[in-house]
């Protein structure tokens, strides 16, 4: 199954209810409205290997896929003191990740999950769970 949501709900569904491996790069992310529309409209034609990691001066970051879809990862945090990957589950059962190489970790997860998504080659079920301005 390939569930793609514009919020963290996809991660909860895959982890807590379906008990499946995360098989797309949209797990624990949010996607703004324009990017989500672009994703739905262009899903079959997106070049998933054409992506870039974008960072700002406030340690925020996202992955821009094929200049169409911006994936934001609010649960992944840069921590200069975290020499190894540290997980922390907050009160809302979000799994937050802290690491001093968080950007490399995000890119690795993006590549691994994208590869898995392309390999299973299953049409996605899109879930619009929230509206995000972008």
PLM region spans:
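Extracellular glycan-modifying ectodomains
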Residues: 1-134
């Amino acid at each position: 199954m390939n569930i793609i949501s514009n919020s963290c709900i996809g991660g909860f569904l895959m982890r807590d209810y379906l008990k499946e491996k995360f098989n797309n790069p949209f797990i624990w992310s949010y996607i703004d409205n324009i990017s989500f529309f672009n994703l739905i409209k262009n899903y079959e034609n997106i070049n998933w290997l054409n992506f870039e990691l974008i960072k700002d001066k406030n340690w925020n970051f996202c992955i821009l896929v094929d200049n169409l879809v911006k994936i934001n990862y609010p649960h992944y945090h840069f921590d200069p003191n975290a020499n190894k990957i540290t997980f922390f589950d907050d009160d809302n059962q979000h799994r937050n990740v802290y690491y001093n190489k968080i950007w490399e970790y995000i890119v690795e997860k993006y590549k691994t999950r994208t590869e898995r998504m392309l390999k299973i080659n299953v049409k996605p079920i899109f879930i619009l769970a929230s509206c995000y301005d972008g």
